Amino acid sequence: IPVPYCYRNLDGSMKHIQYEGDLLPGSLSITDYRSYDFQARRPDAIFIQNPYDEYNLTTSVHPFFYAANLKQYTDKLVYVPYFTLDEIEPENKKAFINMPHYVSMPGVAHADTVIVQSERMRQAYIGFLTEAAGEDTKQIWEEKITCNSRIPFLKTK
């Protein structure tokens, strides 16, 4: 299901919605988002790669695909970042400066599971979110945030 998106105007309003499903090769089996009934189908899991929802100032997925909305249609909303970052040492406070721009986002908060690139990045997310939300939330982040090496079929060397 190709997800529609848009660019934003300077005032934050959405320009017209872009849908690229019709640009994909005919050999691919795709489903138009307008014909897929999320409520009736209720997928076991939905994977998202865009955590920003309404907080991205330049682009946005269609609001239907915001994490808070998708969560109602599945028992397992999974966020996997579309980007890879340089490794962050959890004790390096300077590295935390940019983390609010990709960690404190709705996709992370609403996801049931967050899969990051490494154990070190997992610890950085947990440390940042615990510091931001309070020590009493640490277990929530420890259970929610995982990485490839913790998922048997994704283990990498």
Give the role of each language-model region.
Residues 1-149:
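Active-site and donor-binding regions of nucleotide-sugar-utilizing enzymes
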Residues 147-157:
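Short, conserved secondary-structure transition motifs
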